[in-house]
Amino acid sequence: SNNIDWKKIVVAGHSQGAGHACYLGKKKLVERLIMFSGPNDYSTHFNSPANWLSDDGLTELSKQYALLHINDEIISYDFQILNLKDLGILTLSEEPLLVDNLSSPYNNKNALSLNIPAFSNHNATVGGNAKLPNIWTYLLTSE
């Protein structure tokens, strides 16, 4: 069969790929959606997140996760937070949970942030820091 059973698929992406994964999670009901250093679909021209971010999607919000770095040098952390608020992953008053010195289950939050030293903060969410495997396991398996 050529049919993809999307509800069995975990979709993830980094940077621009985080936006692609997010968009796919809007259009398909996936098992889980993980965004690393994104989504980055913020318009500085209109000073707002892209319209599609607030559209209804098929993947439950409880199955959507994000991992950001607070000192991202490529994409503004503040813009990424506004995007997560438009998605509904964060409430208007929430911030991603800083997890540098925490252990799983990270207060069962769906939006996490790092402030670990890295050569590239933007890439730190998918880099080689020893703290990341536990965070990734949480993103892939938390209920």
Language-model segments: residues:
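Accessory cap/linker subdomain of secreted extracellular hydrolases
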Residues: 1-2, 74
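Surface-exposed acidic, glycine-flexible loop patches that form ligand/cofactor-binding
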Residues: 3-4, 53-58, 141-142
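Short, well-ordered alpha-helices that flank and scaffold nucleotide-derived cofactor binding pockets
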Residues: 26
